[in-house]
Amino acid sequence: EIAVMFTEEGVNGAHQDPQYNVLYRNINMIRSFVDAAESKKIMAFGEMAQIDGAHNANATARDAWKVMPELLVQHAINSRMSERIGIRPDLICLSTVPPAAPPSPDLKLNLPYALALREFFDKYKMRAQMNTKYMDSSTREATVTHVLNLLISRLTSADIQSTITPDEGRNVPWHVYNIEALD
């Protein structure tokens, strides 16, 4: 129903990544992939951009950098499924949200990930490299993280900037940190 509503309303992009439901939410695998296939078909008809949300693993994992290979595999599965269903490659936007945040060494871990993602998936669009922050993080830490994320986006390029919803309200919406990073 959401895909139909978004298409009717002219929404230009939406998340659609069934593997997240299976891997992190323990939702029935068959239901997740059948629902996703139906949604993707409608999104293809409406020429809506698919924003791949494999980055959600980063928000969920305790040691997020350990899921880096898993993120690449998730992107591969979801992108290929989308293409097989009919979404054009230029409408598939991979989330480049980095697999690490402080106190890990940001550029040392995140720049190679950003480069690998672009090397492996060069026919898709790249969504800006921004990490979400938890409610208890300091304003300075969030701003510094976003400055470093912005630097990586500028060094590696990003095609779109999209908003993300807080994961169960645990993350502070990050628009203000983007603005402070640009300042």
Model-derived regions, located:
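Anaerobic metallocofactor- and corrinoid-dependent redox/one-carbon enzyme cores
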Residues: 1-183
